[in-house]
Amino acid sequence: MNAIEINSLSKEFGKIKAVENISLEVKEGEIFGFLGPNGAGKSTTMMILTTLLKPTSGKALVAGYDVVSQAKQVRQNIGYVQQEISVDEYLTGRENLILQARLNHIPKHLVKKRIDEILELIELTDKQNEPVITYSGGMRKRLDLAGGLLHQPKVLFLDEPTVGLDIQTRRKIWEYLRKIHDKFGMTIFLSTHYMEEADNLCDRIGIIDYGQIQVIDSPQTMKNALGNEVITFTISNNDEKKSNLISKIKEIEYVKDITTNGEGITVFSSKGTEVIPIIFQLSSSFGIKINSISLTQPTLDDVFISYTGRELRDETENFNKRREHAKMKRLRA
């Protein structure tokens, strides 16, 4: 059975098509990753699925309920944790969860047990009576996650759950997400800028760009489709010679795909060790000098670049700049 069903969904803002005729299904108990550059349509899609925005056309069901005609029932069956941490830093951890319990109309006789259970799961029992203002960023994010779990939703939506956190804290959050998934068996729909995060957590991922779904599959299947090996090399820029070289490389038997980024060229191949000597021969014939070359295994970053022509790294850097700017404004206030 499917926890989420999207059929021919579109959303337009005036003449802008933010989401264009997308369809996808997410199975019950699945962890599904939704990836895309800024402006690709992923945030708009998530807002529609969480009933914060109405679609222009098409249909979406979440937990068996229509997001437009049965919005109230959808909200009763989902948890939504936003990108920005939304806990009250002047309340204690426990007080924050009590507030969330009341907002979600959890029966009074269940509140204490639920809160104790969640605090133990995210390892905040010892800190529950301390003001959140004393918590680290990772602790605040864990508390934020806990607030989205108290009413035990069937589907948990996570918008960039670890953005802005250091790598050690991100990995700790991944551990908690796995614990949450294993304990409650809930469906998790997450958007993320971290390829490693999607690779580690998700059963399947969908890549959206320009409002359209580009591909949906498991991370491993996507990587396998690119080829067994990735050849990355740099050359001195000469647009005409470079274009001719790329055309010839595409004709090599074992080459599956090729992308470019400035002076860098990335070749996806089933037999990289056999393709590299041919690349050197072709470069020499065009009078092109190869400055550096490497042979690696394909990553989810490579998959993303293959489908969108862009990296997600810039998106994360933009978020960090916005966060730093907001921090400086608070200090000046």
What are these language model-derived features?
Residues 156-159:
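Catalytic Walker B motif of ABC-type/P-loop ATPase nucleotide-binding domains
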Residues 98, 102, 109-127:
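Conserved ABC ATPase "signature" region
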Residues 131-135:
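Conserved ABC ATPase signature
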Residues 175-270:
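ABC transporter nucleotide-binding domain
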Residues 152:
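Conserved catalytic motifs of ABC-family nucleotide-binding domains
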